[in-house]
A protein has these predicted regions:
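Alpha/beta enzyme core
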Residues: 2-272
Length: 272
């Protein structure tokens, strides 16, 4: 299998900060396998996230909680191999950093060593700042995540809009400042009001990457299966479908089946 080569320079944590300073928006997308990541990397995507959304997209689970660190490393290793340009981030799965900072550091080191990614991402604000600092002190870039934090879905009773009232908005802003001071290289803001996400982005030096957070963040991220039209029935307000890969694949597999059953594939030119 051959691929086009890319001469684009490797994006790093420092590059992301420079992009924010220059006013250049950051485009991030998820990927979970080598082939998909290679396509995105060659297209010039700025960053690829191996999200724990792999639990839903790749494993068919109802939420992100079941996926293990071994499964995350498996997917992350494949994606990292594919990327020569994109900044590659791996989610730390539920249970890999919540117990204490020492365990968080050990698992972050394991992910970096075994997968070859550029950074790890974990959810939470003030409650994880000590762990974030410890991981960064170990030499590992960290991406933060505030707002809708899917690993806490049971705590909040669903996937609704976060920081809707003044108290929640104040806490989110304060948490963002704490993570900024701790040294995160980027901060995901998920499903929060646009005005709040814009204000957070203005008040911190860290690049913000939004999903359902409006246009005022320093970048955007989407789950690729949703953005490329591969999933059905999931149509939140923030989602735009940029392709209809599901239809392409359905049409393609239909044509393949017809040709096999009609005995028109393979033909003589396709046989040895």
């Amino acid at each position: 299998m051959g691929y086009l080569s890319t001469d684009k320079k490797k994006i790093t944590a420092i590059t992301l900060r420079q992009m924010k300073e220059a006013g250049e928006k950051i485009a991030q997308i998820t990927a979970y396998d080598f082939t998909t990541a290679k396509i995105f990397d060659e297209a010039g995507i700025d960053s690829i996230l191996i999200g724990d959304s792999a639990s839903n997209v790749m494993c068919g689970n109802d939420n992100t909680l079941p996926i293990t660190i071994e499964e995350m490393i498996y997917h992350a290793k494949a994606v990292a191999k594919a990327c020569t340009h994109a900044f590659v981030v791996c989610d730390m799965p539920f249970g890999s950093y919540q117990v204490n900072s020492d365990e968080g550091v050990r698992n972050a080191i394991r992910i970096m060593k075994e997968s070859g990614v550029d950074a790890v991402k974990l959810e939470g604000g003030s409650e994880v700042v000590a762990t974030v600092k410890a991981i960064i002190a170990a030499g590992i870039p960290v991406v933060g995540h505030l707002g809708l934090t899917p690993q806490s879905v049971h705590k909040y009773g669903g996937y609704g809009l976060r920081a809707k009232n003044e108290a929640e908005a104040t806490k989110l802003l304060n948490d963002a400042k704490l993570l900024d001071e701790a040294g995160v290289c980027a901060l995901v803001l998920e499903k929060v009001p646009q005005a709040l996400a814009t204000e957070v982005s203005k008040q911190i030096k860290t690049p913000t990457i939004g999903i359902g957070a409006g246009s005022g963040t320093d970048g955007q991220v989407l789950v690729y299966a949703d953005a490329m039209g591969m999933t059905q029935g999931f149509k939140p307000k923030f989602l735009r479908q940029f392709a209809n890969i599901r239809k392409c694949m359905t049409d393609g597999i239909g044509d393949y089946m017809k040709c096999v059953k009609a005995q028109t594939f393979p033909n003589n030119e396709e046989s040895y």
